[in-house]
Amino acid sequence: MGSTGNPNPWGTTYDSYRDCSQGVCSVYCPQWCYVIFPPPPSFYLDDEDDSSSSDFSPLLIALIGILASAFILVSYYTLISKYCHRRRHNSSSTSAAAINRISSDYTWQGTNNNNNNGATNPNQTIGGGGGDGLDESLIKSITVYKYRKMDGFVESSDCSVCLSEFQENESLRLLPKCNHAFHVPCIDTWLKSHSNCPLCRAFIVTSSAVEIVDLTNQQIVTENNSISTGDDSVVVVNLDLENSRSRNETVNEGSTPKPPEMQDSRDGEERRSASLNSGGGVVSIADILREIEDDEESAGVGTSRWVEEGEGEKTPPPSGSAANQTNGISNFLVRSSMAAMKRSGYDRAKNYRLPK
């Protein structure tokens, strides 16, 4: 070893070890020193390794996966909601268009207003109501059913009019022919303007029932018209007979025998009046007026002719109460005929014939 006073103790000791082939750690051979004494670890490199390992930890990876899954689920739910809403809106529009198409296809149009022959008109509302739907009493007569899911009596589970599902113990109206069920307010509103099923377009009431109802209404109207106009026609005919008799009685005031012409005229008038009263058909007001004019003309001609061809006795024309009675009966006859024509809607162009 060197002395303590030597400032460089390694100089003398390791001077001989300058050859690195001997594997001695010295100043000149530092590589052998690293083998014997390994260097301490670098703190800078360790920090980088720790940071890289912490950046890719399993917790962070799991958190990222959860967030990504949540984002995917929310996006999927949003897309499905939009698609379903759009589809429901399209179905509602399609149903509304179908209902409008059914309404336009089955909207019955009225016949010609000049058709007065009383034929059966299927476009009229059954029961006498206005419009193309059913009568309120007929709608109320349709069966009402309490809905139960387990019965299986109703095939569908929703109403085709409002597109809402049936609830338990809800009142439904079953159509008689097709057995389709609908909500009571929905189908009642539909049947007020339509007479068929919204789904299958089947008519609620058969055509025979429509014909029976229309025939009954036609008979009622005919009977009412006959009752309202029958009295007027009888009054006119009776007045015609009374007028002819009064004229004959006026002529007979002269205490002279009746000429054959007046007798024939009276017989003809009585026969015409009797035929009008006893006829089983109908009586025309135009014919009545025409016969009245013919009677007046024949009575005037017969009277003048009988006066001219008499034996020199000139009977003055009827005057006083007899003339006033004749004129009064004629005026009353004309007024009664005109009133009958007004009440019955008489038209000379159409020449309607009133029932007796």
Curated annotation (Swiss-Prot):
GO terms for molecular function: transferase activity; zinc ion binding. InterPro entries: ATL1/ATL16-like, Znf_RING, Znf_RING/FYVE/PHD. Its EC number is 2.3.2.27. GO terms for cellular component: membrane. The keyword Transcription does not apply. Pathway: Protein modification; protein ubiquitination. PROSITE patterns: ZF_RING_2. Pfam families: zf-RING_2 (PF13639). It is a single-pass membrane protein. A zinc finger (RING-type) spans 159-201. The chain crosses the membrane at residues 60-80. Residues 261-273 have a biased composition (Basic and acidic residues). Keywords: Membrane, Metal-binding, Transferase, Transmembrane, Transmembrane helix, Ubl conjugation pathway, Zinc, Zinc-finger. It catalyses: S-ubiquitinyl-[E2 ubiquitin-conjugating enzyme]-L-cysteine + [acceptor protein]-L-lysine = [E2 ubiquitin-conjugating enzyme]-L-cysteine + N(6)-ubiquitinyl-[acceptor protein]-L-lysine. GO terms for biological process: protein ubiquitination. Gene3D superfamilies: Zinc/RING finger domain, C3HC4 (zinc finger). Residues 245-279, 291-329 are annotated as: Disordered. The RING-type zinc finger domain mediates binding to an E2 ubiquitin-conjugating enzyme. This is RING-H2 finger protein ATL51.
